[in-house]
Amino acid sequence: MSFNGEKPKPIPESIKDPADMSVNRSNTTQARDILKQDEGGNMNMSLAEMEKHLKTLRLHGMIATLETRIVQANQGASFTEVFACLIQDELDYRKSRLTQTRLKASGLTEQPTLTEFDWGFNPKLPKMDIYELVSGKFIREGHDALLIGSPGTGKSMIAKTVANAAILAGYKVVYREAHTFFEDLFEATQLKRRKKISKLFSETDLLIIDDLFLRKKMPEQAADDLLEIILNRYSAKKSTLLTSNRLVEDWGKLLRDNTASSAILDRLLHHGHLLKFEGKSYRLKEAASRISQSKQKKQDEKGKNMDLSKEDL
């Protein structure tokens, strides 16, 4: 293995990606053999020693691909090519770990994408506006979004899709269903941790409150709690996305505080995107599909039983 500055041979396409390595022996065996051959030459450190030192330096991404990169070097890649690959491996590893950490911290339990969305079922949905939300442009601009419409029209799925896309883009996101949002604030107040949860809700890059007013009876402090967080986020130019099946004109009555409701909507709509969701319910569609499949299954089983009975005769 030589890193002496000679013109490197191109890395074969089949081994550029560690996942695509096509060799007769394992990378571990090859890497150890290569390093053993180099003893007394350019390299005096064993594979185990390299991994130990990389672990001390917490370069776990490099550890994961070290064996593959040694094989690549032996097959003609230059020092700079291999080292660049190792650096990129570490960066990719850290980005992946950070993304997983943020997904877990967000409260999001699923990762939907727009490729899963059935646009044909509800053709009246604001498709272009939805794509713009998922692009994250409104987060970069510090704007807000309200998704208003009938139950089952896709508001929650779009909200979760926006959350997932934002996390993958590197943003910190907090997703809460409305009742959980208010419960978190109430419990934190009782446990004297209000400041901590308020800071979390106020400072995250994107706060999503899903299904606001789904429950008819709102907590007594709902208006004050929501107003506090929205005012904090508005001042900090942090983006908030809310979904609800209730018209904004009804929010004052539902919150039992017209003044607070007006202040909340004033901030949300100042630089806000109001998307109306109209059409049929995706949930009812899925329920109808399940019922149909169940009926078909029963009919098929009944047919099989009849055939077996005829055979017995």
Language-model segments: residues:
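Residue-level preference for the first positions of well-ordered beta-strands
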Residues: D144-L146, L206, S239-L241
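N-terminal pre-Walker A segment at the start of P-loop NTPase domains
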Residues: P112-V134
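Intrinsically disordered, low-complexity and often Lys/Arg-enriched segments
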Residues: M1-K52, K199, I291-L313
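Phosphate-binding P-loop
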Residues: V134-G142
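Interdomain "pre-motor" coupling segment immediately N-terminal to P-loop NTPase/helicase cores
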Residues: K55-T56, H60-E110
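Walker A/P-loop
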Residues: L147-Y171
